[in-house]
Amino acid sequence: HRPRMEEHPDATTKNSIERNGNKVTVRLTASAPVYGMQEVAVNEGDEVTFIVTNNDEIPDLGHGFCVSNYNINFVVGPFQTKSVTFTAGKPGVHWIYCTNFCHALHLEMRMRLIVKARGV
């Protein structure tokens, strides 16, 4: 049977950023050839959770989610949702990009994670 988005409690069709103290939850959609946001800004030391939902309906169209500076890399299949939590301990601009060839414009599927240094 084909997975349905409602089968995952964190599945989303809307993009959002929620902050609760130093915990940041990013709900992010992926639909070829773009992520649902261009950038996310957090503070150094924040605990960041990305919840990524692939909204594509094509059975073999997975999307990668890679933040190489944080050693994060996984693939989210169609109508699947996966998440990752990490501490934003490296100030600077970190590229998030799709590592699974998904579309003719695959190389455009990227966004920025901006980690603001403490005291700046």
Residue map of PLM features:
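Beta-strand acidic-aromatic groove motif in beta-rich domains, primarily in extracellular
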Residues: 59-65
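Conserved "cap/hinge" positions at secondary-structure junctions
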Residues: 50-52, 86
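N-terminal edge beta-strand
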Residues: 13-47
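Extracellular/periplasmic metallocenter environments
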Residues: 2-18, 76-120
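Residues that flank catalytic or metal-binding motifs in active/ligand-binding sites
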Residues: 46, 61, 109
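Acidic, Ser/Thr
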Residues: 53-57
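Conserved aromatic beta-strand anchor motif in extracellular beta-sandwich/beta-rich domains
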Residues: 67-69
